[in-house]
């Protein structure tokens, strides 16, 4: 077991992981509007595959620094690698969507954040989209640093700036979207989550994570 395995096992018990599965089914259903189901999708730093198992796509790919292949559906193509080495592991220009959730804050520097977004841009075909769910330090405040493996502080503005430096064009930016963690105030149960994502006014009350959708220019 790696150090990361120890961290995540302590952070998320089995009951909470099962709860996240049902929450993510509705989050992905909402995000699907920006995802072309006729093109391949890759989930970077996929963890237990909360996103990739629910998305509709012509091919489903997932990557993580840990070998989580046993936790993923059998049709998901899994690559065990660091996100900063994806150019060596995946075909450039192949994907219609690259997805990242609660990942960029784990990188070591803002320079690595820009480089990771450049890599995502390279993986996308023309018109392909990057979707990022990102804790926003301006909204979260000091609790952003409650996790020992958080290194980079990002707001909606710095996220957009990093995307522009990486060659991406912003399609949609929702500063307040999801609560900070599933341990917090996000409604539990699929029906409540479905209502939450369909009622933007409540995002302004509970949202601490930013939704960023960007496109590789055609």
What do these predicted ranges mean?
Residues 1-93, 97-101, 114-117, 210:
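Conserved N-terminal segment of class I S-adenosyl-L-methionine
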Residues 102-106:
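Short catalytic micro-motifs in class I SAM-dependent methyltransferases
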């Amino acid at each position: 077991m790696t150090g990361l395995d120890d961290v995540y096992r302590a952070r998320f018990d089995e009951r909470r992981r099962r709860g996240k599965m049902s929450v993510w089914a509705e989050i992905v259903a909402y995000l699907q509007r920006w995802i072309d189901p006729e093109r391949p999708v890759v989930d970077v730093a996929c963890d237990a595959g909360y996103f990739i198992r629910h998305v509709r796509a012509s091919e489903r790919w997932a990557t993580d620094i840990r070998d989580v292949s046993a936790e993923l559906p059998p049709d998901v193509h899994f690559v065990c690698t660091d996100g900063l080495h994806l150019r060596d592991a995946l075909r450039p220009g192949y994907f219609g969507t690259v997805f990242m959730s609660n990942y960029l804050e784990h990188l070591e520097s803002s320079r690595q954040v820009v480089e990771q977004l450049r890599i995502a841009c390279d993986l996308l075909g023309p018109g392909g989209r990057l979707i990022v769910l990102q804790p926003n330090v301006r909204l979260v405040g000091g609790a952003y640093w409650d996790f020992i493996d958080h290194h980079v502080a990002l707001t909606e503005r710095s996220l957009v700036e990093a995307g522009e430096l990486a060659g991406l064009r912003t399609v949609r930016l929702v500063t307040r979207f999801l609560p900070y963690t599933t341990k917090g105030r996000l409604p539990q149960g699929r029906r409540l989550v479905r209502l939450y994502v369909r009622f933007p006014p409540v995002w302004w009350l509970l949202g601490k994570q930013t939704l960023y959708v960007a496109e590789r220019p055609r």
